[in-house]
């Protein structure tokens, strides 16, 4: 089981709810993934009027836990206000905190992120911060009250997969007891399996499923890959070697003279 703050969940796949072809496709993807947590943008759905109300009803029917986010926020003030509105709407202290600092890369504004995390933690929120793989920033987020960290593996929506495996491995090694969720940049199930093999606790993704030719099938593929990566990590895979090592023992080999 994965423990996030005071909640235990069985699935290690967190699924975003944006950009699906239809509500029916989203619902089927959630079911096939067997996810227990979905992320929701309050700003996007609130702007949808009646459609937003239908969306919220669909989420309730699926019986999953909602992790609201502050997607699209570019300032501390904006992110804090959105988080407070989300708490009122969804009646949860959970918030996926995003403070975007760069329009092209959608890279987090790590200075604003830490400040917003400190404010929200002080007001009783349980913060899931979308951050980079910078260890110093991560330490400051923990000092600000975060008990979960969500480093990216590549820019949002890029589908590039882990662009800096060494940094992700170092992040895991530096925070062995902190729940770590890879967020952003995952494009294929093999990417998800790879980060789980590094020892990460979960993967959050959206575009890789919503933008697939068959989102429901892709959601299931990701769920299987995440499970496989987790099992592989627990099984302690072999480390790469520079030289060949024979897999067949030579004991008992016939000797010809």
Swiss-Prot record:
Keywords: Cytoplasm, Plasmid, Schiff base, Thiamine biosynthesis, Transferase. SUPFAM superfamilies: ThiG-like. It is found in: Cytoplasm. GO terms for molecular function: thiazole synthase activity. Pfam families: ThiG. CDD domains: ThiG. Pathway: Cofactor biosynthesis; thiamine diphosphate biosynthesis. The active site is at residue 96. 1-deoxy-D-xylulose 5-phosphate binds at residues 157, 184-185, 206-207. Belongs to the ThiG family. This is Thiazole synthase.
